[in-house]
């Protein structure tokens, strides 16, 4: 039992374990809230960087940040049943109905831009082109092998048929990114900041305000904006239809976006990360999990025309009230292109 391991390593007696956001085991003491977070995927260097980021944000008086607790032996992590975990401490969560996700994220990024230390292992700034290129090359090589080795499962057939379309979209995203870096100049607000691996609807909400360092990377702020918008459009369509780009408006009331930021954001929306993640996850998953990814692929393939319209609408919105065309249009989007 993890209770016994934590008693041994930290001297903390756990009365009851529960779950935080269906993701992390957690427990409370009279004055504090603790999260038990798996960290086997991180190198020691990356964990150290995440530790210093959390300490920095705590020093900046971020009320929601969780911080690493050292074991009695002075270690940042502990082992349990062959896996590595960290114990994070936060203020007890409470609901905040006045919470504005856009404004709150802008303030979080503002603080993160002041982070004074170099970030290497957890750094992603300036790396999108290379990371996307590697992802494309790997899936393209896999796709070619699949084409040449029938018979195919239904998922294989859908992947084989759809990949050329998403390859084209991916190449457009990389070209858009390259053109942005050539044509535009970053401003002060375009410097690196503390971001999230995936900023989604449930990452922060009025009911879940805790900032979790294991979720973080150091990158350009547009990463979080794009991923939040993508996730909302794909998985919370009703909210998106009602609120539109309110999230982006709230963000810009705190930190207006430069043309460079807007173009980076748009290039990231263009890159079909959701397609790559579903296909990669399917082939890495157990048999019991495959049905979920089959359904997800069907959903995004049936939805690709609406996603193109979303991209066009996002481009138009980011150019509103601008004196010049900040975010160039991708001419073929929304022209009835097929998979």
Swiss-Prot record:
The keyword Membrane applies. The keyword Iron does not apply. GO terms for cellular component: endospore-forming forespore; membrane. It is found in: Forespore outer membrane; Spore coat. Keywords: Membrane, Sporulation. One of its GO terms (biological process) is sporulation resulting in formation of a cellular spore. It comes from the Bacteria. NCBIfam families: spore_yutH. Involved in sporulation. Belongs to the CotS family. This is Endospore coat-associated protein YutH. It comes from Bacillus subtilis (strain 168). The gene is yutH.
